[in-house]
Amino acid sequence: MDPAVLMEAIVEEVNCPICMTFLREPVSISCGHTFCHSCLSGLWKLPGESQNLSYTCPLCRAPVKPRKLRPNWQLASVVDKVRLLGFCMEMGLKTDVCDLHKEQLTMFCKEDDMVTCEACKQSPEHEAHSVVPIKDVAWEYKWKLQQALEHLRKEQEEAWKLEVSEKEQAAIWKTQMERRKQSIRWEFEKYRQLLKEKELPCQQAEEEAAAAQASLEQEKGETASKLELRREAIIRQSQVLWSMIVELEERSQRPVRWMLQGIQEALNRSESWTLQQLEPISLELKTDCRVLGLRETLKTFAVDVRLDPDTAYSRLVVSKDRKSVHYGVTQQNLPDNPERFYRYNIVLGSQCISSGRHYWEVEVGDRSEWGLGVCVENVDRKEVVYLSPRYGFWVIRLRKGTEYRAGTDEYPLLPLTVPPHRVGIFLDYEAHDISFYNVTDGASHIFTFPCYPFPGRLLPYFSPCYSIDTNNTTPLTICTLGGEG
């Protein structure tokens, strides 16, 4: 076999399957595969690679216990020898003697970037060049190597951050895409059920559902392809970066004569290398969950919700008709009755809900912060509260002007294209359904809490939050809808 081909085959065997360069601190896992310790540890830290501390081999996907990583010292020794052998073959330095003059290689030609002997210095090829003793430039180039490595390692850190960020963003997008898919299915099913109960035709709703699902699948495929191309580009950059780092590290550890051969060309490549910033991809979902006609159907369950002033935090000002609330300039002198919230800017509705379907809308205007939903009647009103169904709250919130979130244990970010100025809330007590809609853009679906049995009577929940800026002074106002019961 050709020695070069044989060498290439050997190098492949001692490459890490993740970074595609020589194994560094190789560790073997229970399935028998071997990786760089840093590559494996870094991969398992990325979002989505481990769920509930369940890890898998990147190659065969066999389950692996992360604490069972075994250092492979014998393979590490083999890798070092292969590195040295490959370096010698690449540099073409079989001995320390000049092939032409049979003299020791003791000089370095800066222009030609190569080691020479004393006789070469006098030859026509080098007579006008700066040819200096190796010992005079050894430390200079070792220092340059370290500077170049420092630069590349900083770029490597940025590349790693980019890869982690990309993986996190892709994971968030996949979660949002799955939620949108579920929302479309559930909302159209809800609408079909309501139409059937009213003995109205469902064909148009079924056609709209199929069109929405097809649109979402097309969007999913297009975005997934863009993400994959971007991921491959990031990996290619990382691999080039890794190979340059490995090359310079190898040089820094070799005898001076071998270190200097071709060093300037390697330094030039590393010093000019910078991480390329890729064109950003929009991960904003374009396919809305909007059911035409649903709002008109929900309005048939409209109720006349009014605020209960006895529950309002002392800084909240409730209007005389009990239909709006805003954060007051000063604290009011109000009795600390058991119903009143002591710590938080919360006020509840006065009507308890223990059965049936109910719908109401709230004008939030251009406020930068608010909270809406329902809570159980017996929530703690004096101590710290946690806005989660686990603690009796089904609430969505706006924070910092653009951050829409649902009050669950995961506290997910809600991707809204159009900021809602009016929010619709639908509660189906028997179906354990509490859903929110953006009335501003035609009643697109905002969020539905996972089906969770209500533990008791419920009350509408309102929070205008603080008037921290000029965009948070508009009152929260309960809207009047036709057909209120």
Swiss-Prot record:
TM annotation in the entry: none
Pfam family, one: zf-B_box
UniProt catalytic activity: S-ubiquitinyl-[E2 ubiquitin-conjugating enzyme]-L-cysteine + [acceptor protein]-L-lysine = [E2 ubiquitin-conjugating enzyme]-L-cysteine + N(6)-ubiquitinyl-[acceptor protein]-L-lysine
A Gene Ontology BP annotation from the UniProt entry: protein ubiquitination
Keywords: Coiled coil, Cytoplasm, Metal-binding, Nucleus, Transferase, Ubl conjugation, Ubl conjugation pathway, Zinc, Zinc-finger
Gene Ontology CC: nucleus; perinuclear region of cytoplasm
Binding site for Zn(2+): C98, H101, C120, H126
Residue runs in coiled coils: 144-226
Pathway: Protein modification; protein ubiquitination
RING-type zinc-finger residues: 16-61
Start and end residues, zinc fingers (B box-type): 93-134
UniProt xrefs under SUPFAM superfamilies: B-box zinc-binding domain, Concanavalin A-like lectins/glucanases, RING/U-box
Task performed by this protein: Functions as a ubiquitin E3 ligase. Acts as a coactivator of androgen receptor (AR) depending on its ubiquitin ligase activity.
The record's note on its domains: The RING domain is essential for ubiquitin E3 ligase activity.
Family under the similarity heading: Belongs to the TRIM/RBCC family.
Protein's name according to its UniProt entry: E3 ubiquitin-protein ligase TRIM68
Lineage, uppermost ranks: Eukaryota, Metazoa, Chordata, Craniata, Vertebrata
Gene: Trim68
